Amino acid sequence: MKKLIVSFAIITTLIIGCKTNTKSNDAKTLTVALEPKSNSKVGGTATFTEKNGKVTFTAKMTGLEPGVHAIHIHEKADCSAADGSSAGGHWNPTFKKHGKWGVGEYHKGDIGNFTADAKGNGSITLTTDEWCIGCDDETKNILNKGLIVHQGTDDFTTQPTGNAGGRAACAGIIK
């Protein structure tokens, strides 16, 4: 009888453990490394996590000039050019004007600005239901796009780029 109870307890624990583990794997997570461009020393990582129909984006950068910088998703996951130009323009699958995220018209790649501290470290986080990781909706799918950290600030007005300056770092958003 003890063997039966012990066996039942072990099987129950395994079933509950597997079920819990499956639920924690519902999130899709992708982390990419930012590489320096345009003779900068900028590096860092960006993580995209999709859960419950929303993507949370977090980027952490180092080597920046202190001050405000723009960050955008660009058309291509190609960082081969020394100045990052191979990533193309801002990702704009809905053909909107450049602007500020969540205000009027804006590109799906118009993430916005963040501030680098006196040591050159900066971070930004955004959560949205306007992106997905690897879905069939090409107006939302961020895979195979580029992530660009700019040397300057996005003014949210100048078309089509926000006058954000050169490209300080690039990452391909690829699996």
Language model regions located:
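Positively charged n-region of N-terminal signal peptides that target proteins for export
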Residues: 1-4, 19
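Sec-dependent signal peptide hydrophobic core
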Residues: 5-12
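C-terminal motif of bacterial Sec signal peptides marking the signal peptidase cleavage site
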Residues: 14-17
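N-terminal leader/targeting pre-sequences
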Residues: 19-68, 73-175
